[in-house]
């Protein structure tokens, strides 16, 4: 009987990209960070949930900081040095994700707020009464 061929695992190739864009999406429940090249191809990504935070802990600034540090480390492995940052969403992890990316050692050239603002479009969800 022939021996079954083991599945081949391809090692990630090391891309040599010097500058890129960090997309930080901070919602009320989670924070997602994707670092891409100038064309928009994802190089590295991370989120609060991917770092092991569950439930309401995902929406904390600390969880956003841990996720940003992880995505930043992955991007530095590909040779990335300078970043433009695009932040969108109303969540609490926006500022801490920015500081974490700066702490990893990136040279940040610009910060843009890409949060979509409606010109009185859809009806908003009902207000919370606590």
Swiss-Prot record:
Gene3D superfamilies to which the protein is assigned, alphabetical: Ribosomal protein S11
> Does this entry carry the keyword Mitochondrion?
no
GO MF: rRNA binding; structural constituent of ribosome
Q: Enumerate the UniProt keywords alphabetically.
A: Ribonucleoprotein, Ribosomal protein, RNA-binding, rRNA-binding
Q: What is any one of the record's Gene Ontology cellular component terms?
A: ribonucleoprotein complex
Biological process terms from the Gene Ontology for this record are: translation
Query: What InterPro entries does this protein map onto?
Result: Ribosomal_uS11 (IPR001971), Ribosomal_uS11_bac-type (IPR019981), Ribosomal_uS11_CS (IPR018102), Ribosomal_uS11_sf (IPR036967)
What SUPFAM superfamilies does UniProt report for this protein, alphabetically?
A: Translational machinery components
> Per its UniProt record, what Pfam families does this chain match?
Ribosomal_S11
The role this protein plays is:
Located on the platform of the 30S subunit, it bridges several disparate RNA helices of the 16S rRNA. Forms part of the Shine-Dalgarno cleft in the 70S ribosome.
Q: Which family does it belong to?
A: Belongs to the universal ribosomal protein uS11 family.
This protein's assembly is summarised as:
Part of the 30S ribosomal subunit. Interacts with proteins S7 and S18. Binds to IF-3.
Mind telling me which HAMAP family this protein's record contains? Ribosomal_uS11
Q: What is this protein called?
A: Small ribosomal subunit protein uS11
**Which organism was this protein described from?**
Gluconobacter oxydans (strain 621H)
